[in-house]
Regions:
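Hydrophobic, well-ordered secondary-structure elements that form the walls
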Residues: 79, 130, 153-156, 166, ...
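Hydrophobic (often cysteine-bearing) scaffold residues that line and stabilize catalytic clefts
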Residues: 10, 29-30, 79, 83, ...
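Active-site/catalytic core of tyrosine-dependent DNA strand-transfer enzymes
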Residues: 8-15, 59, 80-140, 173
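Basic, Lys/Arg- and aromatic-enriched nucleic-acid-binding interface segment
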Residues: 1-50, 58, 69-73, 93-94, ...
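Catalytic-site neighborhood detector that most strongly recognizes the C-terminal catalytic loop/helix
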Residues: 8, 66-72, 84, 106-108, ...
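Short, polar N-cap/turn motifs at the start of nucleic acid-interacting alpha helices
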Residues: 54-61, 140, 161-182, 204-211
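C-terminal catalytic core of tyrosine-transesterase DNA break-rejoin enzymes
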Residues: 35-46, 132, 147-173
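Short, contiguous acidic/charged loop-to-helix segments that flank catalytic cores in large enzymes
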Residues: 5-6, 22-25, 66-76, 103-108, ...
Length: 211
């Protein structure tokens, strides 16, 4: 099968996707997880394996531990209003369990059943959901879940946000010996500024009646 080309989504596509993801015939944790990727610029695997113990709703931060980060470095992810709203919504489904965007067949079918654990979504969950339900999303050109992360980064650079800061927000591996030591100062406030910019851009895109 031919792979979908890497790309960033335009504003019309973002509007359509955000408003149509809920039409997909999948568990809500998948649609919420996809939106969460765009809000936080995080990787699909990071979202799928996010645990409630890593989320600080009051502090508005998600701490991805080093053993889960692709580059092996702890990553503090600031949470904007969109991300917090998604977490409050998914909490109704998985609150009290292990994984934020996890799945437990018994609990999802019978909410009265008491369960303490759920399972993280399969590696292919996001990709499969979008591939099978693409016709429901309302855009012409196919895209991958990772394109949501890429789109967030593109939106930031398009309004003049520094590529260096975008790289830190994406938790890319620093180049050079000196750069590899920068994590003693996490640049959290700079990353929060970027996440707030994403909120502002999404507000502008999603507040219109139609595009």
């Amino acid at each position: 099968l031919k792979k979908t080309a890497k790309r960033s989504l335009d504003t019309r596509e973002i509007y359509a996707i955000w408003n149509n993801l809920d039409k997909m015939q999948v568990t809500p944790v998948i649609t919420l997880g996809l939106k969460f990727m765009l809000c936080t610029l995080t990787r699909g695997v990071e979202v799928r394996k996010a645990e409630w113990s890593e989320i600080d709703l009051e502090g508005k931060v998600w701490v991805i531990p080093n053993h889960k980060a692709k580059n092996g470095r702890r990553h503090l992810v600031p949470l904007n209003r969109f991300a917090l709203d998604i977490l409050q919504e998914v909490k109704k489904l998985t609150g009290g369990l292990q994984y934020v965007f996890g799945w437990n067949r018994i609990k999802n079918i019978d909410h009265s059943r008491k369960v303490s654990k759920n399972h993280d979504l399969k590696d292919t969950a996001f990709n499969h959901a979008m591939r099978v339900n693409f016709d429901q999303i309302g855009i012409d050109q196919k895209f991958t879940p990772h394109d949501l992360r890429r789109t967030g980064a593109t939106l930031l650079t398009s309004i003049g946000y520094s590529r260096d800061w975008v790289s830190k927000l994406l938790n890319h591996t620093p180049s050079g010996v000196t750069a590899s030591h920068y994590d003693t100062f996490d640049y959290f406030e700079e990353k929060r500024a970027g996440i707030e910019c994403i909120q502002y851009i999404l507000d502008r895109i999603l507040s219109v009646q139609s595009i």
